[in-house]
């Protein structure tokens, strides 16, 4: 088996079906298998999708195990040369996987690989390339210096904004939304750390791949990632869980500095969480009173991912109907 694709789902049935539809074309010509680990969804994901996706192996959990443990359940069932951790809210181009596998085959020391992710508005997702969140790198991000100087090699290292978007590059942290790994590298580095329930586990595993002597790479082949569509990033719960995950990472890899880091990191967690709580409460009150500004797009953005021939037809359709569209051309194998 060349490739095993592991998808962890939780109440994202419609996104998951779109993801699977894109994968069916992407795996053509590849010896691949697809696993969906459902974390006890309330939207009947397994019941609704299992019958119409008979080539997919569904595993229904009796409760929510979290991202790391659910992925590990899938990984342990596979013996493929490469493993891909893929978010259910993604759409993969028909040649994305072939390009990634070809790159990994040609770079024997590549332990992990990430790709160029596009957000639902068509812009580049900054987490496509990230640097290791050392204490100083994390400090620069939390205090806003990373956002102010995104292309600076030191201040902007969290998102590695100094790297070109259209060229392959060595990076440090791969996003768990699309994380392809070599089996031998994964065996040496170990599976995802299940102390992380959600967020941070991709950072931890990426770091362990580097510490095991492998390289992590960014490849500019594009996928669509609906990040934020099912998660309110400004919510109290999201901010608290995210920064708690960062605290677990710091304790694990920078334990010798924990005396100096625990207090400021904890302070950052609760400051960010409190700010998010105030913001969401304020927005709720404004919305209730009718003062909330309309943030809806006047015109939706359409993203077409296909071959050059198909894109030409899509472009004509968009032009005739005045659609705001972006086009991703995949190469014909």
Protein language model regions, located:
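Short, flexible, basic/aromatic active-site loop/helix in glycosyltransferases
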Residues: 132-171
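Conserved donor NDP-sugar-binding/catalytic core segment of glycosyltransferases
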Residues: 91-127
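Short aromatic/hydrophobic "clamp" motif used to bind/position activated sugar donors
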Residues: 83
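A short, conserved alpha-helix in the catalytic core of glycosyltransferases
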Residues: 164-167, 172-222
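Glycine-rich, basic loop-to-helix element that forms the pyrophosphate-binding segment
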Residues: 60-78, 99
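A conserved acidic beta->alpha catalytic loop
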Residues: 22, 38-46, 63
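Active-site-adjacent helix/loop segment of glycosyltransferases
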Residues: 207-285
């Amino acid at each position: 088996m060349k490739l095993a694709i592991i998808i962890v789902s939780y109440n994202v049935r419609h996104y998951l079906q779109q993801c699977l539809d894109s994968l069916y074309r992407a795996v053509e010509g590849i010896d691949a298998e697809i696993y969906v680990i459902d974390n006890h969804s309330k939207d009947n994901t397994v019941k609704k999708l299992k019958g119409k996706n008979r080539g997919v192996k569904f595993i229904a959990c009796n409760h929510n195990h979290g991202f790391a443990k659910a992925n590990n359940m899938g990984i342990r069932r596979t013996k493929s040369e490469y493993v891909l951790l893929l978010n259910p809210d993604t759409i993969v181009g028909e040649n994305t996987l072939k390009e990634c596998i070809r790159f990994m085959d040609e770079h024997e020391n590549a332990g992990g690989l990430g790709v160029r992710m596009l957000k639902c508005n068509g812009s580049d997702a900054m987490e496509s390339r990230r640097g290791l969140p050392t204490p100083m790198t994390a400090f620069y991000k939390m205090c806003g210096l990373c956002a102010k100087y995104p292309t600076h090699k030191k201040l902007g290292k969290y998102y590695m904004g100094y790297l070109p978007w259209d060229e392959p590059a060595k990076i440090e942290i791969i996003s768990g939304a699309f994380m392809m790994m070599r089996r031998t590298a994964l065996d040496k580095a170990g599976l995802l750390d299940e102390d992380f329930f959600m967020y941070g586990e991709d950072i931890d595993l990426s770091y362990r791949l580097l510490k095991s002597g492998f390289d992590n790479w960014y490849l500019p082949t594009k996928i669509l990632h609906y990040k934020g569509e099912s998660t309110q990033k400004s919510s109290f719960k999201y901010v608290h869980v995210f920064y708690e995950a960062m605290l677990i990472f710091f304790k694990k890899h920078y334990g010798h500095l924990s005396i100096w880091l625990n207090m400021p990191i904890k302070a950052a967690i609760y400051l960010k969480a409190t700010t998010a709580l105030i913001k969401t409460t304020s927005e709720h009150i404004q919305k209730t009173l009718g003062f909330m500004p309309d943030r809806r797009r006047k015109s939706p953005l359409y993203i077409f991912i296909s071959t050059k021939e198909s894109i030409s037809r899509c472009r004509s359709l968009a032009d005739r109907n005045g659609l705001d569209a972006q086009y991703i051309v995949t190469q014909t194998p």
